[in-house]
Every structure is written in structure tokens, then in C-alpha cells.
Amino acid sequence: LQYGLNVATERGRNYDKYIAGMQTTVQHLKEAFPQAAILIVSVGDRDYKTEEGELRTMPGIKNLVRYQQNLAADEAVAFWNMFEAMGGEGSMADMVHAKPSLANYDYTHINFRGGKHLAGLLYESLIYGKEQYDRRRAYYEEEP
């Protein structure tokens, strides 16, 4: 599940209504598909122009990521921090200005190439997590 980029604001500090809606969504999915694994993907970086005309990460983004991470923990579902995968603070501008570009000039949305890049990073994270799980599990399966 990846929702929330458009609720982020420059001064956003309280995302309780968003979280309440997401909790309801996650709970409905758990009831409808009890065997399904659920992954919450955080919002990515989103830039805005300061009064001085400089591009900066919108202050509400990191706060929203924290809310999303807490939601995943509270609901016992997986979480992937796309903001950090993008490169964290200021990464949207880097993606826009990459050659070839990985994001749109609205400094909000990734493009197809950016999506493909991030999908690769998510895939690598999932494979790494599975490998770590298998290694830990091997210790429990050994006989003393």
C-alpha cells in the first residue's frame, strides 16, 4: 500500500485522520485476505520552493513517514521507507536532474524510469530480507 503523498503539506504535523483511514484499510484487507502479506510503502521525497526560491524537502514529508512507520508497526505489517531509498532529504531534486531524469519537474512525482529504479531497490530489499530470515531460521532448525 502506498498512499499519502498528496496529503503531505509544507507544515504538516498531524496526520491522525490519514492514519485512521489507513488503519481501517489495513484492517479490512486483513479480514478479507487473512493469509496475505501487507507492505506499507512510505511516501517518497517531495520538494517545495522556499521563500528564497530554493528547492527543499517539504517539512511535512519526514513527519508523514514517521506516521506511516508507526502505522505499520501498530498493525504488524511490513514497512519499506521509500523516502530513504530515494536518498532522503533533497533526493527528489537529484532524481529530477539525473540524466536521464527519474522524476517530473513538479518535484513531486517520479516518472517511469524512476519507478523502475525504485522497484529494483524494493526487490533487492525483499530478497535481502528473505535471505536474512532464512539464515536466522537455520539456527533454530539445527539440533543441539
Report residues per predicted region:
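Active-site segments of SGNH/GDSL-like serine hydrolases
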Residues: 2-6, 28-63
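The substrate-binding groove and active-site-proximal loops of carbohydrate-active enzymes
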Residues: 4-19, 52-57, 106-109
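Cell-envelope and extracellular/periplasmic
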Residues: 1-16, 23, 43, 71-73, ...
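Generic, well-ordered alpha-helical scaffold segments in large soluble proteins
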Residues: 25-28, 32, 71, 125
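Catalytic His-Asp segment of secreted/periplasmic serine-dependent ester chemistry enzymes
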Residues: 45-144
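Generic structural signal for well-ordered alpha-helices
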Residues: 22-27, 65
